[in-house]
Amino acid sequence: MLINDTVVAPATNISTQAIALIRVSGSEAFLIVNKLIKDKKLEEKRGLFLRKLYFEDELIDEVVLSCFVAPNSFTGENVVEIACHGGILNTNKIINILIQSGARMALRGEFSQRSFLNGKIDLIQAEGINNLIHAKNELALKIGVANMSGSNNKAIIELKDNLLDIISRIQVSIDYPDYDDVEGSSIEDLTNLLEIINDQINKLLMRSKMAFKNSEGIKTAIIGQTNVGKSSILNALINEDKAIVTDIPGTTRDIVEGQINLENVSLNLIDTAGIRKTSDVVENLGILKSKNLINEADLVLFVVNKENINDLDNQEIFELLKNKTYILIVNKAEKLSKTEKQNLEKKYQNIVFTSAINHDIDQLVLRINQMYLNEEINKNDELILIGLNQITLVEQIKNKLSTALSIIKSGMPIDIVNVDLYDAWNLLNELIGVEYEDEIIDNIFRKYCLGK
């Protein structure tokens, strides 16, 4: 893939703001920007410069230019970043003039793509930048920063090197069958080495899938009888009146959705119809949906109050919650005495007390964060991948290694093993971008922001 033109895009949101940043990158970056400068033309050198921009002798703006000379820039190309006065009209006008002067409007993620293609960052770092920008919670932010910096990427390099070592040992035994006493080349040795790599890949996949789910959002159903405060819980969590809150039983007949981003996890919240005995056909459809959502949800927030906790309808819900991850929420806790709370804590597991109408849900938020505080995905020195394409590649690597292990343990000819090991090694190269297809790379970077 060869990209040799010069591109421009806003690096900040185009809106009514004090300052906007416009990025120009490519071999002709200085030449194009100089077309807008009358006096003190830019030289190809690094620095900060104050200049006035003109178009057809009309003063457009007074700006600060941050200049970088290839290869010492983010993209590896000549780069001029224009800090101009903000505003939709002003920012767009400068961009349009730069396009008329020879630049092309950059595609989404094209600056990061150029950085990757010019060897400034690998593919894991590139995806880390995107993860950082789109992080919904502290966990995703932490993973994005770690992957962007490349601090944990050596794990993939080590896996590649170790796998190549096994491939080489097998190849030696194939090419020189008489030398069967080469150290570390016995079937037992190769199996042990391969199992170590397989275990590392399995752990990477486990961490990554868990972190991906926490980052994208856990499907969370808020269930309970009518008028116990389910909608108040939803509104308190997302800090907006998305669900109708009244004293009339059966107000929420359908599904209401919202999202909340906590420290360790994001929740995709679903407020469901209250579960009760009713002859109302429409309400019964909502109740059936509520019961089905219990099976589909990753986490259930089961809301009760002190008056109805032992009702038969709630006992039915407790039965549905067997083998499910759930939190029992006793709402309207302001009506409970300290002794009543202690007695309930002794009787029920994973219980919290809230007063959602007063927005007192601290216990609930703390409990959810604790539940999803996983040591495996909170280690600072472990590689975690949360891009869907990355996780798919790791799954493919896992499958190739599993097949290779099955072959070597079955006693089949050793040369057959190398086919799957070579495939796994090539997939590791694809993971960090040593090998890639142009269409796949385009697809990855088009998911990025314009200007990045």
From Swiss-Prot:
Q: Which NCBIfam families match?
A: mnmE_trmE_thdF, small_GTP
**What is the protein name given in its UniProt record?**
tRNA modification GTPase MnmE
Compartments, record wording: Cytoplasm
Protein family: Belongs to the TRAFAC class TrmE-Era-EngA-EngB-Septin-like GTPase superfamily. TrmE GTPase family.
Q: Detail which positions bind Mg(2+).
A: 231, 252
Q: Which residues form the TrmE-type G domain?
A: 217-373
Q: How is the cofactor bound?
A: Binds 1 potassium ion per subunit.
Alphabetized UniProt keyword annotations: Cytoplasm, GTP-binding, Hydrolase, Magnesium, Metal-binding, Nucleotide-binding, Potassium, tRNA processing
- The residues that hold (6S)-5-formyl-5,6,7,8-tetrahydrofolate are 23, 81, 120, 452
Needed cofactors: K(+)
Task: Give one Pfam family, short name only.
Answer: TrmE_N
EC top class named in words: hydrolase
- The EC number on file is 3.6.-.-
Superkingdom: Bacteria
- What InterPro entries does its record include? G_TrmE, GTP-bd, GTP-bd_TrmE_N, GTPase_MnmE, MnmE_dom2, MnmE_helical, P-loop_NTPase, Small_GTP-bd
Q: Look up the record and report any one GO term of the cellular component aspect.
A: cytosol
Assembly and partners are described as: Homodimer. Heterotetramer of two MnmE and two MnmG subunits.
* Positions that bind GTP: 227-232, 246-252, 271-274
